[in-house]
Amino acid sequence: DENAEVIAEYAINFGLSMPNDGRDNPTDEVVKDLRNRLRALFITYIYQDIPLVDDPMQSIDWMIHMDTIVVRGDGYQNHVYEVFKEMFFPHTTFYQQQFDYSVDQLFDFFMDLENRVICKIASQETIYGATKMHDRWMKWEEKTFGPIGDEATLENRDFSKGMFGAFFEANPDVSHTEDGMQFLMHQPDDYGGSDMIFWVYPQNEVETRILDSLSMKFGDNSAFLAESEFKGSIMNGHSIFEKPFVKYGDKYYCFTPMIPHRNLFLIAEKLMMRNGVYYQKSFQQNTSPISRDVYIESKVKSVMKSFLPDVTFYPSAHYKIVEEGVKKNPELDILGVSDKAVYIIEVKAHELSYKDRVRLDGAKDKFKASVAEACKQCCRSVDFINGSTEPAFGTQQGAVLIDKTKPIYKIAVTFQHYSSLLGQMDKLVAASLMEERFRDTWVVSLFDLMVVADFIESEDEFLSYLDMRKIINTNHSTFHDELDLLSQFLNDGLADKVMPNKPMMIIGGSSDIDEEYAKDFYLPMNFGSEKE
């Protein structure tokens, strides 16, 4: 079930909104009925505000809510992990002092979570869980007793409680036979075994501190059912994304390991926000060298340089203009210059909160403050170049004179992922969220830019892609995903198919890119047809 993750989140929100006063475990029939009801509500919410007339603002509202309900994750795992580490590791001293664990320890714990749950599940369709259980045992065995198979170690071992008795004692969340000789696996639909399957047993004090800082108890999520416009809505209940674990008695549970995986940035940021002074000074303000804004600008520059080695990039390039009779000295985030082109790059680190997405106005305001504002600033820089006889930017390396005979490309890079909205440029312009003159700016998220960097092999190829993107944005075409365009550009000659004044609907293609990245990240569980 491709929507199982969202439905599980919905169930967790309901479950944590009230005390756990039930005395009896639910039967299989009750669980299946609950799942079907939640699935029906899920479908209802998807179509609840679908536009019934051709109104661009209604369409955009629906798309924002659709993304909020359905879309999970903004980038490929290797890119997400890379950016997370680079953004938060400089703050590890703060986490150590505030929570007594490091960012590295938090990250490693999250990375191990999925295996700790999956390793308890097996079926006729897959032995993935069993292989992960073997890996878990091997890791524990070597850490506890040294190399497996060492004769001296084996001679001194106490096997009175069974071959795996010591492991079972140290890992009480793993089901086993009474003699300690065999592991017992759970079927995917073994609802009665949920207490064991989703139990996360801390291996040390660090893990206990992590779990304590990120756990909710039954009843803590009462706001989910409080009287409001979004009472019990699938778009309510963001607390489970900030605190993804459940504490019941002295046990901790993780009912879907994907929640911490999908919300790495949110969780780390919310932890930091518990110390408002540090958060504002060191993470929010761009005067701090380890702030989010400073990092993202630096990351965009390094990503661009990684696949455009012959382009010189200048951060924080200044230029002088006069607007409405007032002299100004605006700053361009990144100026790129090569023998072939000039790149005008603006970077925005805005993020949409869950509240922004649900209430819509916040999402649209932040879209304008990030995407539209970045496009506006790009246009201002290009206007300066075109309006000057000898346009020059001030940089740390000195003045950089721009050759006006070279083509100029405007690029706006955002941290937030807006790909599906940006594929509806006509609607964005009609709804006044974008201006007509912004169409020829390539707007891309940092994570999509990292994919482009992995696949584009030369500046000439990149310029061809930018030329294609300019046509798509200006010829009233529509698309769903930037990576669909990239894949069709690389594999299907899309650049030769797009034409000015000939709109296209461009769908599909990104699965080819998915497959390339999936080679490094084996996707664990696919039980085929869903069991009822």
Whereabouts are the PLM-identified features?
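Extended, hydrophobic alpha-helical segments in both membrane/secreted and soluble proteins
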Residues: 300, 330-334, 345
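Short, solvent-exposed loop/turn segments at secondary-structure junctions
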Residues: 320, 350, 417-418
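Acidic, metal-dependent phosphodiester-chemistry machinery of nucleic-acid enzymes
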Residues: 1-294, 298-306, 311, 324-327, ...
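Active-site beta-strand-loop-beta-strand hairpin of nuclease catalytic cores
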Residues: 336-344, 348-354
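Active-site metal-binding core of divalent-cation-utilizing nuclease and nuclease-like domains
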Residues: 314-332, 336-339
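Catalytic cores of nucleic-acid endonucleases
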Residues: 349-411
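Beta-sheet entry/capping signal
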Residues: 312, 333, 340-344, 407-411
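Short, solvent-exposed loop/turn and secondary-structure capping segments
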Residues: 346, 356-357, 423-424
